[in-house]
From Swiss-Prot:
Biased composition annotated in UniProt, kind: Basic and acidic residues: 671-687
Record flagged with keyword Ubl conjugation: yes
Gene3D superfamilies xrefs: Pleckstrin-homology domain (PH domain)/Phosphotyrosine-binding domain (PTB), SH3 Domains, Transcription Factor, Ets-1
Name this protein carries in UniProt: Epidermal growth factor receptor kinase substrate 8
CDD domains, per the entry: PTB_EPS8 (cd01210), SAM_EPS8-like (cd09540), SH3_Eps8 (cd11764)
Amino acid sequence: MNGHISNHPSSFGMYPSQMNGYGSSPTFSQTDREHGSKTSAKALYEQRKNYARDSVSSVSDISQYRVEHLTTFVLDRKDAMITVDDGIRKLKLLDAKGKVWTQDMILQVDDRAVSLIDLESKNELENFPLNTIQHCQAVMHSCSYDSVLALVCKEPTQNKPDLHLFQCDEVKANLISEDIESAISDSKGGKQKRRPDALRMISNADPSIPPPPRAPAPAPPGTVTQVDVRSRVAAWSAWAADQGDFEKPRQYHEQEETPEMMAARIDRDVQILNHILDDIEFFITKLQKAAEAFSELSKRKKNKKGKRKGPGEGVLTLRAKPPPPDEFLDCFQKFKHGFNLLAKLKSHIQNPSAADLVHFLFTPLNMVVQATGGPELASSVLSPLLNKDTIDFLNYTVNGDERQLWMSLGGTWMKARAEWPKEQFIPPYVPRFRNGWEPPMLNFMGATMEQDLYQLAESVANVAEHQRKQEIKRLSTEHSSVSEYHPADGYAFSSNIYTRGSHLDQGEAAVAFKPTSNRHIDRNYEPLKTQPKKYAKSKYDFVARNNSELSVLKDDILEILDDRKQWWKVRNASGDSGFVPNNILDIVRPPESGLGRADPPYTHTIQKQRMEYGPRPADTPPAPSPPPTPAPVPVPLPPSTPAPVPVSKVPANITRQNSSSSDSGGSIVRDSQRHKQLPVDRRKSQMEEVQDELIHRLTIGRSAAQKKFHVPRQNVPVINITYDSTPEDVKTWLQSKGFNPVTVNSLGVLNGAQLFSLNKDELRTVCPEGARVYSQITVQKAALEDSSGSSELQEIMRRRQEKISAAASDSGVESFDEGSSH
């Protein structure tokens, strides 16, 4: 971020002295100046080689360094601000509160003054004559800013001196300080000139100062949430146009979530929401700082008599600049994404509730809209669109003023995806956070919207695979008696099934998605037995939730029977088969001994019951099965994805459905197959059919009870803190909760009692994650109260027991004495 610039172009960058960190300008020929040709590496070497022989008079003594202006303090005894150390101490406090706002600029040193120059416009912001610089000091490794240059300046018109602090990265503060001090010394008129030696010393410091890179940094490796979204725009657009509103399948996708999956997803969404709120708060503070600088600048200009700039006005002018438009657009996108998350989390968060946070967000939203001069810029932000649930939630929550602001932002803030034309491309939104944080991936089928977008976009890249799936779906539709049911095929493609192919443009992708009804589909009946056996190793424990799934333990070796969907059908070493999610499996080489296909002992599984009570394969063509239940006949049709699509219309003969999606799907298929068998085999009466169905249902219940499988949980040590905890305990606890280093360093110096004494506002002031810290502290306090309450109860019971024992003891002694007297 920091750098430095000199005055002449070169092949190494903007200026020739960029390699050695200073901008001293040796003598060049007039021809070089006129033609402005770029200096070659050899010429640059010769210039540096001859520099030592140049006379002092031939050196222009101008050097430039790229620095970050951190802050400026007025040295005043009333504010306990007297020395540079006082300024560094206050800088640390501001840094802990997140209130240091850096500004990139160029610090120029010549034989008359130290100047600050705007990096973009190259205008001079400040000019400190050397005789006004009272003190120059380098402060190294004293805080998170490890190379701070301190300048104490006082112009004749000032009553109190100013302390300016700069962070110097590429050229360290001690070198710049030596340059400035030598210039001050030479300006006082000594016989021995110090500055040429100082510049030579900086020049010789080349090995410790690496040159800036010639090329930009390479792009980081893509993650699931950040994978070349632009290159898949055309593919995703074609898919979106073909499928419509991509939000609909998500509603059904989450119905099979286990409590653990839901808790992980909610925790992830809460983390994203917290980071969004932090970034919005940071941006609002940045706007406020710019407004304060502008107000102070206006006040100074109003009170100023002459046209000459006063001390500090140049830096104020730079700080008064508003953020660039890209940052405004990013902030508006985070507002919209935040509203979507609040609608998702409205049933899961409290203190503050989702409605409270909506009201909280509309205040800064209004500020940002006003800062842009009206709603035009906000109205241009298309992605992300608000979900239908979000729009309903906002309609129910907002008050009159908030509704007026919301409506002024237009259709991009008020219409869900279904209300936009199918052919209009809505780019997927992947949030980028200021501190570089990325949301954690969820290792189960409840993938995030960003992951779904990537997987869906990637699926289009492999057209052949998509056509095969379309044919399978069409085949299933033709053979299914439940004509109203449509499998959820195509909404949650697994990224590891598809390989990256050449990207299609939008037109080609759209053509690829058109149904190919004239193709023959018998090739899909090719038996799976002809394929070589494949095996996978389980990465985690998995507990089956119904009879179609298979419970596995970590490191189990499983034979893959069908891997064409997101849930794979596998067989374990005992011969039991069922479905498991593919993201807990790793493909492995076949074991030498093989798993064997010996018939396992008889167990009441749903697969065997279907073979006994269902129709024979020869009697009935295959029918599609709702996810994740496998087909009841041994025809190798792939299982559907585990995201069930509810049946909107079912035949009248289906009267009962189990609450489990798998059992429900199974009953639909069984009923449909039974009714298709009736015209062929009428030997059974209606009463026998009812008895068979009753026996079937009861047997399924018994087999489900027998298939319960408990996986032992690993004992994870829990770290807690109390009022007696040491600062080291507090630091360990903060690290165990996953707080960032700024929070750990800011609060890790406190003991337990000090940490518990802070309220929410104080925590937010000290660290950016104050709200999360406060929530965790509240949990710890509640746990301490529970434990202390039980301890107090035990103490009361112990004392009461002692009293009873003492009373009984006294009574026994008295009786003995009485007996003796008698």
